[in-house]
């Protein structure tokens, strides 16, 4: 055996079959091209192929079969194996693509197995509920795993997502003005869908009413704001799985950028802000506008409500605190370099002295009911602010503190690479999403970024939501939902 035969990784039989396949392909190719396009070279090419078969084919039977099939007098004979070589070549390419896909799927499954093993370890250490609320604290320390539990697809970009406070339902609002409700245990088709606006939905909020000493039945309210200048109020009818529109709120003269609904005693109010530079307070029961004030000189992009106070963030890069019943502006925060996308109050949590910003530092702040707030901006930062105490007087509306009316920035979180779109606070963690396609989890105690989800979406991440931890009517669950420009919502569940 020669040296080149030793290097060839084929047996004699395999080499003979390969040679026959090559010759059959050459024979087919010459029939298709040379005979029709280069007729003058026909005989010379045919003779060369026959000669080549004499060198390559070892068995005389194989040579005779090939010469017979190549005979010009036998035009009707077709060798079924003439295209065997190109077919095998194409099969190898398809097989390589399939192998790459299988390797990617295997990598994903291995990651899921690691996450599940981590969850099993956590469950093994999980303690049952005790009188001092041990399990509640464990729930608040939950950080979602790397991969979502389910993926929801809709027809256009997701602009806002909200979890039902009690049921495994997620509400999804889109850039085409559609509103969806999905069952998290059967999310292939929506429970309900509604064309709620003629233009994009910009914001959404939900509230499960808690009417006491009243004949009114409690139910879930869904409020949406839109670029069509309208605010729509819906009742979620659980028995029929549908949205029932209660009313529309009209009054803003430009895009309605954010909406918030809250309840105090048996009174339910809705707050909205707009590009017309105003903030409006609405009565939920009759739809009347109770108050309108202008806290900023430019587009008001975000609001949050705590009792009689509203915090607002604007295109003018500032955030302001306002006493909404009187319309008195109380204090202002400056420090962002670009427009503010989201603002939120940081609510106090009882019996959590170890969590920074979640307990009051003085009795005066405790009596007032708030001390800190957080803002997210297009300057890629998240800032936590201490709100100055206003001048509080009995039976009179609060007024600005003449010696201290400026927010004090106590912590700046840096890590996002583009506009920060939304934030949510649970326990000692702050979750944020941004146009850099990532979601981040921050530790409020240290200011460190604990976890980054970088491949949840292929476009901007516009919204996220977790259960609140400060409402006694809402039991926090280990769930998080995100919505993005790629028309997808990712849901994380334990």
Swiss-Prot record:
An example Gene Ontology biological process: establishment of mitotic spindle orientation
Main subcellular location of this protein, as a coarse class: cytoplasm
GO CC term, one of those recorded: spindle pole
GO molecular function: dynein complex binding
Residue span, LisH domain: 14-46
Record keywords: Cell cycle, Cell division, Coiled coil, Cytoplasm, Cytoskeleton, Microtubule, Mitosis, Repeat, Transport, WD repeat
Coiled coil: 90-123
Protein origin, superkingdom: Eukaryota
InterPro entries: Dynein_regulator_LIS1, G-protein_beta_WD-40_rep, LIS1_N, WD40/YVTN_repeat-like_dom_sf, WD40_repeat_CS, WD40_repeat_dom_sf, WD40_rpt
Location within or outside the cell: Cytoplasm, Cytoskeleton; Cytoplasm, Cytoskeleton, Spindle pole
Cell division in keyword set: yes
UniProt repeat feature WD, residue ranges: 153-192, 196-244, 251-292, 295-334, 347-395, 415-454, 457-492
Role summary: Positively regulates the activity of the minus-end directed microtubule motor protein dynein. Plays a central role in positioning the mitotic spindle at the bud neck during cell division. Targets cytoplasmic dynein to microtubule plus ends, thereby promoting dynein-mediated microtubule sliding along the bud cortex and consequently the movement of the mitotic spindle to the bud neck.
Quaternary context: Self-associates. Interacts with NDL1 and dynein.
Comment on protein domains: Dimerization mediated by the LisH domain may be required to activate dynein.
Cited HAMAP family: lis1
Sequence similarity: Belongs to the WD repeat LIS1/nudF family.
Protein name: Nuclear distribution protein PAC1
Organism of provenance: Saccharomyces cerevisiae (strain JAY291)
